Amino acid sequence: MSLLSDLINLNLSETTDKIIAEYIWIGGSGLDMRSKARTLPGPVSDPSQLPKWNYDGSSTGQAPGEDSEVILYPQAIFRDPFRRGSNILVICDAYTPAGEPIPTNKRHAAAKVFSHPDVVAEVPWYGIEQEYTLLQKEVNWPVGWPIGGFPGPQGPYYCGIGADKAFGRDIVDAHYKACLYAGVNISGINGEVMPGQWEFQVGPSVGISAGDEVWVARYILERITEIAGVVLSFDPKPIKGDWNGAGAHTNYSTKTMREDGGYEVIKKAIDKLGLRHKEHIAAYGEGNERRLTGRHETADINTFLWGVANRGASIRVGRDTEKEGKGYFEDRRPASNMDPYVVTSMIADTTILWKP
């Protein structure tokens, strides 16, 4: 195994200028991630320098067998924490040979929203709190839980330490450092209320980069869980009963919200979000009705409610924002399995572009 490890960690720069680019895309479910690698003649610093590529869409549920070619357009580059050196991870979106975005390509529509002059002028910032659950591979049951049984009630696990309270920290810390190495604007991690559940935060990130960074952070996390022999779940309610679900709370502000008088802008934006509550819920992740019950720090899925420091609301405004009269708010409705391109662009569209 030591020879295998040595080969995996070979420093290519000592013998060649060539690099490895891992092209990453979203598969047919809209949540599964796929990737494959190719050799390039030398280091690359911008996606525009990368060639387009293709893959067999009939094997990912994204194209019929008789016309299976799907084209990958490179969109964002990150350093590769697995191969290191000058090797890169490449976030791509997917198109038909005719240049039309395929149905699971949500980035294309999001990029249109974020390139609108009114949105560009507002410099939208996002901070996304991505919750997830680590599962034992053979039994599909949270790590640290007795097989077929349950741990003690919730309470000691949130931000907890100790072998009886924190399960999977080695994966979490490896992911944290790998994201920092890759150039992801990861801002923190913490253990969650349900044991075996964790959270990482990405942001503040501007516009389309928020979606790119969440997707590559998810990719890095699943690669690490693959190495650890653990299953990664983004199910919004992985365990029935008196256990917290998993969300992707999305913190948001615009330039005018961050300036003096911004609190009034925030309140108007929240009013607009309330008017489109059903449309947002429909786009905020599958199975969210199992999570948004009005319990476990959620608002009921059919009710739109906002408040200051209220974690049982749809939208939470922080006390600092209220006190300073400017800042940001948190949309607590998105599920952990949401598409960040959809959620971020929809919030921008509703609060900046949409006219009720």
UniProtKB/Swiss-Prot annotation:
EC category name: ligase
Major localisation: cytoplasm
Enzyme Commission numbers on file: 6.3.1.2
Assigned keywords, A-Z: ATP-binding, Cytoplasm, Ligase, Nucleotide-binding
Biological process, per Gene Ontology: glutamine biosynthetic process
Span of the signal peptide: none
UniProt region (Disordered), positions on chain: 37-64
One function term, GO molecular function aspect: glutamine synthetase activity
Catalysis performed (reactions): L-glutamate + NH4(+) + ATP = L-glutamine + ADP + phosphate + H(+)
InterPro entries with a match to the protein in the record: Gln_synt_N (IPR008147), Gln_synt_N_sf (IPR036651), Gln_synth/guanido_kin_cat_dom (IPR014746), Gln_synth_cat_dom (IPR008146), Gln_synth_gly_rich_site (IPR027303), Gln_synth_N_conserv_site (IPR027302), Glutamine_Synthetase (IPR050292)
SUPFAM superfamilies found in the cross-reference section: Glutamine synthetase, N-terminal domain, Glutamine synthetase/guanido kinase
Ligase keyword on record: yes
Domain GS beta-grasp: 19-99
Entry GO CC: cytoplasm
Domain GS catalytic: 106-356
One Pfam family cited in the UniProt record for this chain: Gln-synt_N
Location within or outside the cell: Cytoplasm
Self-association and partners: Homooctamer.
Family from the record: Belongs to the glutamine synthetase family.
UniProt protein name: Glutamine synthetase cytosolic isozyme
Source species taxonomy: Eukaryota, Viridiplantae, Streptophyta, Embryophyta, Tracheophyta
Gene: GLN1
